[in-house]
């Protein structure tokens, strides 16, 4: 059934003359990491918060005890670190030890090539929404500038407000990879 829906959407987009693309999880992370002149992203949790707050996020999230979490995003970050696209460094920022994620030289090249290839196209998000890539880039940059480098507690206050407004159920049965993520957030997020 979803193949039929996707074919129908593709047909409509093509008839409208819209050149569209779909992005992989790694490409979404790449676009966020490259935003704001490729400034480092402070804290792994920042990736999760930004994509959680982004209304057109391609990732599925659940709310853990102290932060939103996406297993898909977690796996993308690991693959990008393992593949040499992202570099992780430990830094002291405002007297706190944190992880800083930035694009490697290879990652910067991949980012520039991707951005040039897709800039004038539309992106199909979650097989539902079509957005101009230029808008997506601007939105990700705005979110990065707004939330990157914020203390975890300030982001948690935002999350709590979002949770209260959207009636999320807190899931207390955690899997091992979720527990590992929480440990990293607590260690490097200043909790």
Question: Predicted segments — roles?
Answer:
Residues 2-191:
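Domain-edge interaction signal
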């Amino acid at each position: 059934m979803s193949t039929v829906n996707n074919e129908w959407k593709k047909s409509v987009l093509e008839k409208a003359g819209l050149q569209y693309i779909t992005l992989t999880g790694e490409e979404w992370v790449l676009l966020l990491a490259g935003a704001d002149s490729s400034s480092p992203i402070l804290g792994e949790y920042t990736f999760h918060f930004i994509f959680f707050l982004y209304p057109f996020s391609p990732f599925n999230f659940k709310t853990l005890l102290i932060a939103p979490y996406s297993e898909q995003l977690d796996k993308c970050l690991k693959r990008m670190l393992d593949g040499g696209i992202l570099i992780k460094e430990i830094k002291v920022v405002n007297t706190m030890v944190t992880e800083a994620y930035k694009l490697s030289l290879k990652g910067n090249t991949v980012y520039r090539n991707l951005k040039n290839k897709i800039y004038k196209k539309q992106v199909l998000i979650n097989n539902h929404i079509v957005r101009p890539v230029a808008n997506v880039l601007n939105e990700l940059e705005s979110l990065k500038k707004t939330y990157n480098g914020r203390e975890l507690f300030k982001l948690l206050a935002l999350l709590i407000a979002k949770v209260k407004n959207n009636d999320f159920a807190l899931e207390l049965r955690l899997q091992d990879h979720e527990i590992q993520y929480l440990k990293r957030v607590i260690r490097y997020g200043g909790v």
